């Protein structure tokens, strides 16, 4: 007789294979069409709140694997809180203004045409470009399974948003923190605009290394009592020498005169002698203070160069005498101001060419006018003649524009700054920002020191840009005096106009049209500021425009979390902190989480030229988005994160095990109508206790955002305990026990309890798969849930664990022997075996099930196949063949006769 039809075999419509690339897009489309996010909000009304404020990606180009990592991590955290019962908010957004979009428009229509168009037309083309890529990226982000307010995302180019960026600027101006002055800033000669520190990256560049002798003035030589002397400077920027105004020395150092008449730092003398910059012995020594305020002569143009002292002068290279051009260097400028000097020479125009200033101030011969500074370098060396002591070339790390990748320079121009050290109401922005950082929770903790160090050492924030596509610094200036007009009524009027017409109104409307009725008579006396805001000010104001003032349901200010790549310590985290602290005197976030960058499996940066780029769109097509999400969850994001086909295949294998576990659990509760743990067996209590321990630990780790450690623990539990032991052990009772036997129903109830919480636990990461599981789950699991978003995680009830570590160790040792017996073809199946032992712990009901053998007893006849001792040799475990016969229904060796059913199966069939 074939007994297969008498078995209660598992049944489920949940497929073994996910066919993720084909099925995920349909599921995601369904979620968004059914407004799942709105239902999530309704499901948690009145609960504790959590909001993650989205750092806006740039609306240009397709998303890359770094975007995917970032958005998936955000989504996992938001969903973790949701499935823990929190009322969550996540409003995605886009950064829409700025140079890269302007460059793309220029690339498309040509530079000449762009420069011939009115500003409003250029801005319209930029707006169209940004809008196109917002739609492209929106679909790509949604295809990652990211849930949020996609129906009402924030865009920094929306009219009301632009108005709020302007309002944030006005608030800062009213507090007196907006200052305008000439100051050296990073300047991109290619794009003709100022740059912030965060917009500069360092690349290798070949430059000159020159030593130049500045002869001392006659007065200086007379004061020092010497006949012939020059002070020697070292520089890598010959083009700045015409703008030299001083030479800085270290106040704590000694300076010496060589036999050949050159003054350098004493500490560097031997090195310079070896390099043939100086020669002979030291003939005289000076304190730096003896040289202070003396004059040297610039050999290029005969202008005086004053000797000053500065702490910034170091002894780690050069001559200890620093060429100082305050129009072309941040430190040069600072030390120059300390001395109270007001004049600054800055003879370079927007394009990096010498201006007419070199003629009017007699800095260089007239032939240099209009010459690019880099082209001028070798010609300047020729002009130096014998004063050029030494010249060579070398490669060093040099600042470049992060967008066009051309070298940048320091150039003093009139710009708007947010003042870091200006005292307002007895405090400075720098001090307030540093105090606020102390209140923020950082993951990883190293982020706090990193952000603090950057804020402590940063210069004033240059927020003005000389471009077209951005929010204008929409203030008026008095034509006659140049004074900036910061007037509440005018600001409010411009704000209201921007809300309706956008910031384009600044360019489209006349001054009179922009003024309120009561101020229109002022129009003829005013002019507009033409600069636009740094895009970092845009993104730094998102808390103001989204959480405080805008038409968004994005959660409260300050946000519970900001989450971005570690490069944002110098970018968005800092700009947001400075804008928020300027206006509200507090940080805009309660916590900051940072992640590393994506690299290939060798740890190398991805690039098209190397052919190692992994595109998220391709991963989704080949493996499925769930594999990408599981890759994020199982990776340690605190450092760089490796990704490759090989790594994704390993993740896919892990996914398969999780999916099959869920499938097994669902299939084996298909006929369960009610979860009822009336008298759970020892094995049920063991897995419930272990599940409680593991799930609690996983939830705690999720709460610390340590997903990789949590998944390592959870995956290990699923594979080695839930699947390899419990599910395997329970097959007999599930398939062979009578339908309603207590033993079977208790195990089914145990599985139902576990799978319900496992679904809620895995849902933040494997949302698609868990939703699919709910779709195919029986009523006892699903209850009234429409989908996975109607689930909420509930901690399991504590149960005493009846199986200790010693029993598990005995089981491990037993299965090592079983594996050997199978390899040696002594047995095919553990059910052929019986265990004879004198150890009371093993002589209990169900232990045979736990060891997957037919019988455990203290006395079993027959040959011993192997044995081992436990508990200091006191007890023995003997592995024998079962003396009984194989039951043709359950395959256990418990039948009294060959071909007969065992007692349990006889009852199951015949009652």
From Swiss-Prot:
<keyword id="KW-0436">Ligase</keyword>
<dbReference type="InterPro" id="IPR014729">
    <property type="entry name" value="Rossmann-like_a/b/a_fold"/>
</dbReference>
<dbReference type="InterPro" id="IPR033708">
    <property type="entry name" value="Anticodon_Ile_BEm"/>
</dbReference>
<dbReference type="Pfam" id="PF00133">
    <property type="entry name" value="tRNA-synt_1"/>
</dbReference>
<dbReference type="GO" id="GO:0002161">
    <property type="term" value="F:aminoacyl-tRNA deacylase activity"/>
</dbReference>
<feature type="binding site">
    <location>
        <position position="608"/>
    </location>
    <ligand>
        <name>ATP</name>
    </ligand>
</feature>
<dbReference type="InterPro" id="IPR013155">
    <property type="entry name" value="M/V/L/I-tRNA-synth_anticd-bd"/>
</dbReference>
<dbReference type="GO" id="GO:0008270">
    <property type="term" value="F:zinc ion binding"/>
</dbReference>
<dbReference type="InterPro" id="IPR002301">
    <property type="entry name" value="Ile-tRNA-ligase"/>
</dbReference>
<dbReference type="InterPro" id="IPR009008">
    <property type="entry name" value="Val/Leu/Ile-tRNA-synth_edit"/>
</dbReference>
<feature type="binding site">
    <location>
        <position position="887"/>
    </location>
    <ligand>
        <name>Zn(2+)</name>
    </ligand>
</feature>
<feature type="short sequence motif" description="'HIGH' region">
    <location>
        <begin position="57"/>
        <end position="67"/>
    </location>
</feature>
<keyword id="KW-0547">Nucleotide-binding</keyword>
<comment type="function">
    <text>Catalyzes the attachment of isoleucine to tRNA(Ile). As IleRS can inadvertently accommodate and process structurally similar amino acids such as valine, to avoid such errors it has two additional distinct tRNA(Ile)-dependent editing activities. One activity is designated as 'pretransfer' editing and involves the hydrolysis of activated Val-AMP. The other activity is designated 'posttransfer' editing and involves deacylation of mischarged Val-tRNA(Ile).</text>
</comment>
<comment type="similarity">
    <text>Belongs to the class-I aminoacyl-tRNA synthetase family. IleS type 1 subfamily.</text>
</comment>
<dbReference type="GO" id="GO:0005524">
    <property type="term" value="F:ATP binding"/>
</dbReference>
<dbReference type="InterPro" id="IPR009080">
    <property type="entry name" value="tRNAsynth_Ia_anticodon-bd"/>
</dbReference>
<feature type="binding site">
    <location>
        <position position="902"/>
    </location>
    <ligand>
        <name>Zn(2+)</name>
    </ligand>
</feature>
<dbReference type="GO" id="GO:0005829">
    <property type="term" value="C:cytosol"/>
</dbReference>
<feature type="binding site">
    <location>
        <position position="564"/>
    </location>
    <ligand>
        <name>L-isoleucyl-5'-AMP</name>
    </ligand>
</feature>
<keyword id="KW-0479">Metal-binding</keyword>
<protein>
    <recommendedName>
        <fullName>Isoleucine--tRNA ligase</fullName>
        <ecNumber>6.1.1.5</ecNumber>
    </recommendedName>
</protein>
<dbReference type="GO" id="GO:0006428">
    <property type="term" value="P:isoleucyl-tRNA aminoacylation"/>
</dbReference>
<keyword id="KW-0648">Protein biosynthesis</keyword>
<keyword id="KW-0963">Cytoplasm</keyword>
<feature type="binding site">
    <location>
        <position position="905"/>
    </location>
    <ligand>
        <name>Zn(2+)</name>
    </ligand>
</feature>
<dbReference type="GO" id="GO:0004822">
    <property type="term" value="F:isoleucine-tRNA ligase activity"/>
</dbReference>
<dbReference type="InterPro" id="IPR023585">
    <property type="entry name" value="Ile-tRNA-ligase_type1"/>
</dbReference>
<feature type="binding site">
    <location>
        <position position="890"/>
    </location>
    <ligand>
        <name>Zn(2+)</name>
    </ligand>
</feature>
<keyword id="KW-0067">ATP-binding</keyword>
<keyword id="KW-0862">Zinc</keyword>
<dbReference type="InterPro" id="IPR002300">
    <property type="entry name" value="aa-tRNA-synth_Ia"/>
</dbReference>
<comment type="subunit">
    <text>Monomer.</text>
</comment>
<dbReference type="Pfam" id="PF08264">
    <property type="entry name" value="Anticodon_1"/>
</dbReference>
<dbReference type="GO" id="GO:0000049">
    <property type="term" value="F:tRNA binding"/>
</dbReference>
<keyword id="KW-0030">Aminoacyl-tRNA synthetase</keyword>
<dbReference type="InterPro" id="IPR001412">
    <property type="entry name" value="aa-tRNA-synth_I_CS"/>
</dbReference>
<dbReference type="InterPro" id="IPR050081">
    <property type="entry name" value="Ile-tRNA_ligase"/>
</dbReference>
<feature type="short sequence motif" description="'KMSKS' region">
    <location>
        <begin position="605"/>
        <end position="609"/>
    </location>
</feature>
